[in-house]
């Protein structure tokens, strides 16, 4: 199967909910974090993975490095910082800034960098999610992240903060205290993640507090939280340039370089201002800046054309709006961003009166998932978490609507599973082919083989089964290794309950995990149908 086919036809669940709770409550978090996350972020985690080819992941890393190469150019830095706020013009900033988020759309193999964030959230949530993955079948065994890889990711997160300290304070004592700062943190949507970070730091011997910026004080050349001197601030504020009154102490500490602040205002100016996307997609400007041809071409191939909205271009942009997406230059989280084909004249006037860019619209990827009531198509984007030009982790975000959100049932962060085959083809395990065999089991003990293609069509609501209407059936999905095109061994069995309405539409029924298990007689009947009385053991 190809990557696109997997994203359309694989309905296997990879998220182990019990393991998720265990990771939140015991392994990474503290008691109560799981319930907080459930209350605040009910759609934080998707149950199914997104499949991405290794070639696309490699190109994402190359785009990250291309952006880094441009930002490192003195001419570019001078040009950008000349008009940036004072907090971005602080000289000799050594910290490189943690948690860059490079957000991509992937549409039928075409990859596009949609935006860059300099305080991307969700990294710890993805660490938790990775700990709760399970392999649904043998074909997935090599794709699910190992405990070792997840532990290494978490260690690298801590090492990243320690490196920020060493870069900013060469020769100083080791990092000791961290403040995780956001405005009214306990009211933030991702507050549970702040607690996970606090616990992560504490497990590695660092004192950590979660604080509102107004709780910080600048005195005696040191930033304080109460009586605790703060070495480093992990900055989750969307007050990117520390302009709000509540950020006054943090602003002064930053201007005086009395605290290590990461991410910091200079990084936002150099990377995240969306006007930079207009530069990255303009070959003439890149050439004038002295960007090498290979880097120019890489960016032109992977950054949708973007331009700054001006009054002079208003008539042309309005006429072309259906192919454009409009974003505020300092926006974040999809706020005040609009698809051009849905624009009203009133909103258009607001765009013209603000600071916006117009980006060529690029479709997000599509992942078909099995939700509570039916199969549905979800959009997805890809977020590459990066530090110092290196990708640390790639996650997907499943959603419905104009922009990414965590309000869609069945949506949220999803793990990215990738093949090692750069061609995008997947699964050649155990030296043979594999196939799924589907059976429906009724209350009378009868077993009905169901062609996999029909099952997919039913799950997608693209087909009906009126002859089965009005029943609740158990569904068995046997993942089978083939030999010479014939079933050889069952390598995984998945069961569930499905309700067929009077029109023949199939819907998932929420039920205990063992509710769909077959009887001994039913299982023997399936074995007979599958192997035609061969003696192969299951």
Language-model-detected regions and their locations in the chain:
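Preference for protein termini
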Residues: 1-538
């Amino acid at each position: 199967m190809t990557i696109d086919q997997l994203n359309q036809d694989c309905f296997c669940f990879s998220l182990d909910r019990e393991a998720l709770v265990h990771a939140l409550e015991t392994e990474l978090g503290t008691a109560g974090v799981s319930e907080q996350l459930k209350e605040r972020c009910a759609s934080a985690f998707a149950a199914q993975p997104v499949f991405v080819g290794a070639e696309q992941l490699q190109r994402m890393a190359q785009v990250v490095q291309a952006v880094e190469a441009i930002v490192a150019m003195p001419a570019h830095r001078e040009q950008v910082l000349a008009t940036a706020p004072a907090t971005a013009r602080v000289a000799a900033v050594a910290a490189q800034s943690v948690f860059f988020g490079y957000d991509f759309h992937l549409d039928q193999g075409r990859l596009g960098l949609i935006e860059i964030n300099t305080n991307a959230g969700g990294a710890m949530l993805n660490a938790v999610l990775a700990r709760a993955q399970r392999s649904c079948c043998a074909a997935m065994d090599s794709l699910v992240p190992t405990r070792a890889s997840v532990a290494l990711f978490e260690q690298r997160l801590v090492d990243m903060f320690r490196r920020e300290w060493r870069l900013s304070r060469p020769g100083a004592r080791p990092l000791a205290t961290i403040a995780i700062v956001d405005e009214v943190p306990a009211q933030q949507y991702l507050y549970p993640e702040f607690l996970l970070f606090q616990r992560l730091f504490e497990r590695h011997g660092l004192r950590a507090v979660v604080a509102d910026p107004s709780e910080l004080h600048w005195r005696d050349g040191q930033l304080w939280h109460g009586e605790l001197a703060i070495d480093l601030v992990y900055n989750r504020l969307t007050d990117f340039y520390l302009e709000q009154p509540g950020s006054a102490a943090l602003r002064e500490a930053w201007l005086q370089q009395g605290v290590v602040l990461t991410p910091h205002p200079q990084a936002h100016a150099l990377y995240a201002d969306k006007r930079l996307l207009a530069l990255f997609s303009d070959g003439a400007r890149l050439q004038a800046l002295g960007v090498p041809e290979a880097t120019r071409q890489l960016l032109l191939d992977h950054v949708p054309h973007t331009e700054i909205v001006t009054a002079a271009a208003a008539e042309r942009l309005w006429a072309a709006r259906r192919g454009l997406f409009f974003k505020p230059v300092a926006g974040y989280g999809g706020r005040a961003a609009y698809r051009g084909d849905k624009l009203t004249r009133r909103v258009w006037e607001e765009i013209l009166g603000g600071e916006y860019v117009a980006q060529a619209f690029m479709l997000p990827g599509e992942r078909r998932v099995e939700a509570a009531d039916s199969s549905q198509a979800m959009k997805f984007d890809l977020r590459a978490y990066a530090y110092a030009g290196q990708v640390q982790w790639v996650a997907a975000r499943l959603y419905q609507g104009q922009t990414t959100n965590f309000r869609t049932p069945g949506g949220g962060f999803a793990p990215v599973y990738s093949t090692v085959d750069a061609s995008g083809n997947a699964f050649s395990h155990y030296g043979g082919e594999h196939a799924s065999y589907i059976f429906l089991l009724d209350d009378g003990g009868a077993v009905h083989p169901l062609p996999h293609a029909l099952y997919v069509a039913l799950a997608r609501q693209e087909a009906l089964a009126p002859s089965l209407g009005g029943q609740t059936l158990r569904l068995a999905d046997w993942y089978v290794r083939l030999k010479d095109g014939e079933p050889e061994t069952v390598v995984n069995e998945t069961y569930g309950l499905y309700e067929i309405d009077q029109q023949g539409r199939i819907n998932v029924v929420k039920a205990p995990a063992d509710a769909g298990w077959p009887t001994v007689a039913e299982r023997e009947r399936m074995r007979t149908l599958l192997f035609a009385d061969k003696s192969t053991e299951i």
